[in-house]
Design a protein with these regions (language model features):
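Short, small-residue-biased leader/transition segments that mark boundaries at the very start
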Residues: 1-4
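ATP-dependent carboxylate/acyl-activation modules
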Residues: 60-63, 144-147, 153-398
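Short, charged, surface-exposed secondary-structure boundary motifs
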Residues: 18-26, 114-118, 290-294, 311-317
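Non-catalytic interaction/clamp surfaces of large macromolecular machines
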Residues: 110, 114-162, 276
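Short beta->alpha connector loops at strand-helix junctions that form conserved
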Residues: 11-18, 107, 283-285, 304-306
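Short, well-ordered, mixed-charge alpha-helical segments that flank or form enzyme active sites
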Residues: 46, 69-72, 92-95, 102, ...
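A short, charged helix-loop
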Residues: 60-83, 87-126, 180, 185-191, ...
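Acidic/Gly/His-enriched mid-domain segments of enzyme catalytic cores or analogous surface patches
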Residues: 8-79, 87
Length: 398
């Protein structure tokens, strides 16, 4: 901190001659602070006023806001969350950004390095273009912060759509090479990428589908996806058995797919997985030997999935707006099923149907899934006719 460094430091209380009050809720909200930030150096009337009231000019403002989102994510009670709504910090950011003609604003730790680079390049002087860039970044921080607070209070009401992401990832391209692609969000909160090339737009679509699918299963399960649909899936006592039976469902379509499991991948499983070409593999962890085997191909994307909760809402852009719905977390149980045929299914058949239902729920309609013994045998997906989907599934099962 500055106080522990050799740099001269003055407490806010010394500047304002007023103590921090209300348990720290009011510290910087004072004319001697905001006057020094907002005064226009080129306006004689402003300069006369700050001289009259002995307000020092403030040329650089650095703010680290209270961690509101992190506090919400921690599951804290509302009183603790409320205390993490920053008042003075946001006000400092907005004031300094508004007066970017004369003031540099550093509104988050992400801007420390650009600011340091600027200082190393040409010292303590800044250009209007540089100050305007920092102001833009600052308003991005403040708008994101306010959106997070609104979304917390709005809860499940959905009274308005507010979506904000501080981190932007430029992708190699969009769905096709001629399209630009970006990802807004924090992938690092969900995955550690420990090997491989940069994740693409299409990779992200498959990864999203894979996560939604694997979360349906509690037993040790392995799934293989292509174009957002499962082409292989099995639940077995071990990850090796789950992999072998998932691959057996459609070994042709598995080529170049995205692989996901909810179990730790060991050496035995890695040796078998390594025999095919795939784009991405996702697991909660890997044995050291397994990583050494899977990392032999430099472009393979190897992800460790973190225990991060998925949003409760799903969004889809279309026309000139956005569709929002609750994430489908419904899980059917045998007790909810109604027999409408003369012949009633056996307990094993009901188990197979509920297993298949988890897969078809995460397949592109119209879709038919054939499964038995906790294994995907074949599927017909993305058909305009359910009859055609069934024909496709039967043909693939032969």
């Amino acid at each position: 901190t500055r106080r522990s460094s050799d740099l001269p430091c003055k407490a806010v209380e010394d500047l304002t001659t007023y103590p921090s009050i209300l348990g720290g809720r009011v510290k910087t909200l004072h004319p001697k602070v905001f006057g020094g930030i907002l005064c226009r150096r080129g306006l004689e009337q402003d300069m006369q006023q700050i001289e009259k009231y002995e307000i020092p000019e403030i040329d650089l403002v650095i703010v680290d806001l209270y961690p509101f989102e992190a506090t919400v994510a921690s599951g804290a009670e509302e009183p603790a969350i409320i205390e993490k709504i920053d008042i003075g910090g946001i006000s400092l950011i907005r004031a300094a950004a508004k007066n970017y003609n004369d003031v540099v604003i550093i509104a988050s730790q992400a801007q420390y390095q650009p600011f340091r680079d600027m200082l190393m390049e040409h010292g303590a002087t800044t250009t209007i273009e540089e100050r305007r860039w920092f102001a833009k970044e600052a308003f991005g921080v403040s708008s994101h912060y306010d959106s997070a607070i609104f979304n917390y209070f709005d809860g499940e009401e959905g009274s308005a759509f507010r979506c904000s992401a501080n981190s932007q990832k430029t992708l190699r391209y969009g769905e096709n090479p001629h399209q630009k692609g970006y990802f807004y969000g924090n992938l690092d909160a969900m995955f550690d990428q420990i090997h491989g090339k940069e994740i693409s737009y299409n990779n992200l679509l498959d990864i999203n589908a894979a996560v939604d699918l694997i979360d349906e299963f509690k037993d040790t399960t392995f799934a293989i996806l292509k174009h957002n649909n499962a082409c292989g899936l099995a639940s077995r006592p071990t990850v090796l058995e789950a992999w072998n039976d998932a691959l057996a469902g459609d070994p042709v379509s598995a080529f170049g797919g995205v692989l996901i499991t909810n179990a730790v991948i060991d050496k035995a499983a890695a040796e078998e997985i390594n025999k095919i070409f795939f784009e991405v593999i996702i697991a909660p962890d890997y044995d050291v030997d397994a990583l050494e085997i899977l990392g032999q191909k430099k472009n393979r994307i190897i992800l460790v999935r973190k225990p991060a909760a998925l949003p409760k809402k799903q969004f889809r852009s279309l026309l000139n707006g956005v569709l929002v719905q609750d994430r489908d977390l419904k899980v059917e149980t045998p007790e909810e099923l109604k027999t409408v045929t003369t012949k009633a299914p056996t307990a094993q058949e009901i188990e197979d149907m509920l297993f298949a239902n988890k897969i078809v729920k995460n397949s592109k309609s119209n879709a038919i899934v054939l499964a038995k013994g906790k294994q995907l045998l074949a599927s017909g997906v993305g058909q305009t006719s359910r009859v055609d989907a069934l024909k496709q599934a039967i043909e693939k099962a032969k």
